[in-house]
């Protein structure tokens, strides 16, 4: 199968199973696996939308504990003896009586060879019905009137998008934090917490008059509906929409006076602590979202990230590198503890920032990272970027159910040839040990199960594996055996039912050492994304230069192992088609905002890394290596062009998509024509059409993206053009002149090496056999 056909085949599997593997054949020994350089890994999107997939309305057939593997197309079924053999533990299990008519031609859906992914709606049985989803809005009132009004309007609109039975609560904060008692209709009533004081969970519960609703010994059983006292603060939308709207509309700016040389006192930590404490009491393990809307940094109480005085700047990357950080470590510890509490209780924390300055996202990032919450960084709540992104959180499916799952867990089972080493994504470990757990650790490891409080159809996870076989005389025969992995995702559907989605993936094991089909099974796109996740995971704990050196070392080793070359002859270096783009991906990854913090604030870095760890292969690749399209009068429609400074031409329009920004760039001549108004004159309809085409294409790109990208239109030489220039390969710089003799392309003033120079060095090092 040629590379293009293979790529289409892998894309079809991704559409069906929501999974892409770095290697589509597994090495048969640990020694062989270590020589692959890139680990065996999967980018898995558990809730990928599949409109044609059946939803089975019965409980799955499972293997005996402790295995609990689910019946799947890779299981051996003996229809005469009415048994099936689990591929993971090789145990024989009886088929249930309703499967008595099973035969080679009559198979239940879960055994059909194409149903490698199947979803069950689990019967409720004796379990109590889960409570409806809960939304607690935590609103910052220390902001300008227009920004607060825009936020209030967005919140009022969101009420109409919630399921009628959803419970809603409101907490506002400035100098003090206030919990609004929506259930009290005589007048506006709220409980006030001092912003400078740290409250223990027990104190919050006592002050709000909430009795301990659940015994700690029952962590996995959701509670029945809203428990008495909590019903004063959390009410169903259909019952209390009028009261909630009223409270929101009457919200005023924080009345505390702010001197010109001071920041407003903002007790973000106390407000979040109260929200977590309120839900922890009565709604443990119930689907809930705490949605924080903040327009500035915490300056008061626990979790403060910057002082009250404006002359004291908020920390930068430079300050963190030099350890010049007064509040950072204490704030991180405070928010991390709160994130662990929220994750333990099954509650999601979303952070929406509407501010030109930093708000402390770096310190708070694990609130979203541990709980599967959204993170959004915008300049203001008045921006369309915030309004449209916020509304998209409440997108619904064809049955009018919210496209979000609550309280999910993901468990991985493997056959004896494979072991799972860890997961990188928005989850926390459930510390579950099994025979599938590997000896090494990559990401969140030493477990085969993880908890995701929030999960949506785009949530993707990088899951990493190692080979268990030591090799030797008993090594497997090629083509006779498959390594199989099963992913079990339990979650609370927004309709209130519990669902289980099962994906089972099997791949052949390679033959003896040096099997050429192993190299042909390499998916360079999935591999680039899996390596990017590891690099970002390392960047959170290691120094930036160390991470870049690791990326370079891995790339040199991979090329040294899989390229064709004569030793010490760089001109003989050749890569197979399914490896050729990988060095380019790594070149752009090491220049990207994920690993280069220059020109980005710590908050922006936290935001970009958060989004990378949420998206699937296609979207992650756009972030790593943006796409560039060119429009000109010579060609109809768009032409994909190289992400290179040579692509900038005076008579062309460029459309750049970096996932976070969508930019339309007018070449010098095009900009002059536009300013002269040619597009409005008769006879120049072609220029008008040329100017409109990229806008149409940009609208299509924006249509279903979350978070909504920033849209920029600029001209050659304009200040906004820097967004484009920073992403291009600098093949023409002030030191090189026109690379390849071209004089029309843009000169980029940078000391960064070009892709050509990078590749020259890579080939030289790869053929010399040194890393």
Curated annotation (Swiss-Prot):
Q: How does it sit in the membrane?
A: Peripheral membrane protein
CDD domains assigned to the protein according to its UniProt record, in alphabetical order: Sec23-like (cd01478), Sec23_C (cd11287)
Q: Does the keyword Zinc apply?
A: yes
Which is one GO molecular function term here? Answer: zinc ion binding
Arranged from A to Z, the UniProt key words for this protein are: Cytoplasm, Cytoplasmic vesicle, Endoplasmic reticulum, ER-Golgi transport, Golgi apparatus, Membrane, Metal-binding, Protein transport, Transport, Zinc
GO annotation, cellular component aspect: COPII vesicle coat; endoplasmic reticulum exit site; endoplasmic reticulum membrane; Golgi membrane
What's a BP term from Gene Ontology annotated to this protein?
Answer: intracellular protein transport
Q: Which SUPFAM superfamilies match?
A: beta-sandwich domain of Sec23/24, C-terminal, gelsolin-like domain of Sec23/24, Helical domain of Sec23/24, vWA-like, Zn-finger domain of Sec23/24
- The record's principal subcellular location, in a coarse class, is cytoplasm
Localization, UniProt: Cytoplasm; Cytoplasmic vesicle, COPII-coated vesicle membrane; Endoplasmic reticulum membrane; Golgi apparatus membrane
Write down the superkingdom of origin.
Eukaryota
Indicate which residues the UniProt annotation says bind Zn(2+).
63, 67, 86, 89
Subunit composition and interactions: The COPII coat is composed of at least 5 proteins: the sec23/24 complex, the sec13/31 complex, and the protein sar1.
Provide the family line: Belongs to the SEC23/SEC24 family. SEC23 subfamily.
Function of the molecule = Component of the coat protein complex II (COPII) which promotes the formation of transport vesicles from the endoplasmic reticulum (ER). The coat has two main functions, the physical deformation of the endoplasmic reticulum membrane into vesicles and the selection of cargo molecules.
PANTHER family, sorted: PROTEIN TRANSPORT PROTEIN SEC23
The identity of this protein, by name, is: Protein transport protein sec23
């Amino acid at each position: 199968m040629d590379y293009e056909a293979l790529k289409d085949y892998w894309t079809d599997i991704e559409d069906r199973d929501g999974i892409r593997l770095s290697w589509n054949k597994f090495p048969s020994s640990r020694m062989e696996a270590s020589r692959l350089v890139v680990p065996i890994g999967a980018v898995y999107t558990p809730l990928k939308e599949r409109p044609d997939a059946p939803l089975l309305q019965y409980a799955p057939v499972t293997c005996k504990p402790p295995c609990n593997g689910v019946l799947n197309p890779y299981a051996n079924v003996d229809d005469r003896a009415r048994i099936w053999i689990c591929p993971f533990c090789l145990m024989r299990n009886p088929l249930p009586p309703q499967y008595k008519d099973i035969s080679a031609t009559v198979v239940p859906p879960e055994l059909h060879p194409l149903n490698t992914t199947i979803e069950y709606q689990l019967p409720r049985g004796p379990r109590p019905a889960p409570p409806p989803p809960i939304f607690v809005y935590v609103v910052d009132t220390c902001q300008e009137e227009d920004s607060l009004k825009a936020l209030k309007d967005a919140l009022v609109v969101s009420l109409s998008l919630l399921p009628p039975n959803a419970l809603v609560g409101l907490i506002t904060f400035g100098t003090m934090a206030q919990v609004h008692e929506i259930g009290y209709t005589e007048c506006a009533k709220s409980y006030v917490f001092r912003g400078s004081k740290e409250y223990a969970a027990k104190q919050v519960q006592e002050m709000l008059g909430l009795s301990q609703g659940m015994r700690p010994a029952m962590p996995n059983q959701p509670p029945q509906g809203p428990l008495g006292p909590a019903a004063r603060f959390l009410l169903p939308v259909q019952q209390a929409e009028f009261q909630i709207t009223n409270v929101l509309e009457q919200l005023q700016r924080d009345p505390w006076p702010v001197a010109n040389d001071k920041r407003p006192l903002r007790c973000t930590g106390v407000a979040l602590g109260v929200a977590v404490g309120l839900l922890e009491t009565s709604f443990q393990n119930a689907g809930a979202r705490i949605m924080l809307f903040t327009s500035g940094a915490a300056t008061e109480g626990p979790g403060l990230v910057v002082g009250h005085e404006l002359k004291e700047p908020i920390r930068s990357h430079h300050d963190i590198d030099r350890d010049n950080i007064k509040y950072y470590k204490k704030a991180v510890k405070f928010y991390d503890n709160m994130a662990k509490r929220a994750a333990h209780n099954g509650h999601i924390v979303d952070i929406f920032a509407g501010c030109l300055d930093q708000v402390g996202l770096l310190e708070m990032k694990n609130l979203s990272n541990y709980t599967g919450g959204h993170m959004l960084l915008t300049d203001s709540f008045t921006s369309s970027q915030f309004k449209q992104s916020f509304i998209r959180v409440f997108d619904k499916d064809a049955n009018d159910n919210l496209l979000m799952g609550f309280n999910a867990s993901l468990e991985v089972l493997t056959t004896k040839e494979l072991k799972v080493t860890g997961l990188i994504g928005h989850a926390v470990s459930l510390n579950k040990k099994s025979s599938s757990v590997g000896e090494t650790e990559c990401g969140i490891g030493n477990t085969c199960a993880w908890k995701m409080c929030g999960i949506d159809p785009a949530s993707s996870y990088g899951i990493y594996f190692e080979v268990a076989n030591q090799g030797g005389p008993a090594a497997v025969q090629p083509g006779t055996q498959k390594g199989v992995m099963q992913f079990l995702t339990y979650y609370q559907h927004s309709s209130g039912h519990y669902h289980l989605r099962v994906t089972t993936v099997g791949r052949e094991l390679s033959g003896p050492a040096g099997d050429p089909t192993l190299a042909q099974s390499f998916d360079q796109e999935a591999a680039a994304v899996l390596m990017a996740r590891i690099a970002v995971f390392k960047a959170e704990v290691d120094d930036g230069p160390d991470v870049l050196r690791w990326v370079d070392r891995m790339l040199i080793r991979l090329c040294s192992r899989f390229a064709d070359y004569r030793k010490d002859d760089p001109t003989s270096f050749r890569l197979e088609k399914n490896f050729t783009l990988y060095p380019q991906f790594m070149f752009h990854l090491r220049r990207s905002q994920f690993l280069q913090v220059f020109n980005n604030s710590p908050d922006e870095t936290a935001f970009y890394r958060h989004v990378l760890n949420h998206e699937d292969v296609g979207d992650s690749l756009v972030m790593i290596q943006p796409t560039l399209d060119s429009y000109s009068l010579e060609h109809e429609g768009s032409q994909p062009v190289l992400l290179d400074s040579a692509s900038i031409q005076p008579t062309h329009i460029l459309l750049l998509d970096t996932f976070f920004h969508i930019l339309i760039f007018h070449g010098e001549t095009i900009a002059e024509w536009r300013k002269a108004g040619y597009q409005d004159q008769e006879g120049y309809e072609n220029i008008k059409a040329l100017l409109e085409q990229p806008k149409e294409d940009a609208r299509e790109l924006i249509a279903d993206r979350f978070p909504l990208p920033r849209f920029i239109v600029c001209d050659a030489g304009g200040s906004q053009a820097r967004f484009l220039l920073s992403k291009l390969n600098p093949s023409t710089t002030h030191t090189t002149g026109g690379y390849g003799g071209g004089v029309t392309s843009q000169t980029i003033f940078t000391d960064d090496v070009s892709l050509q120079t990078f590749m020259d060095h890579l080939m030289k090092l790869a053929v010399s056999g040194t890393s």
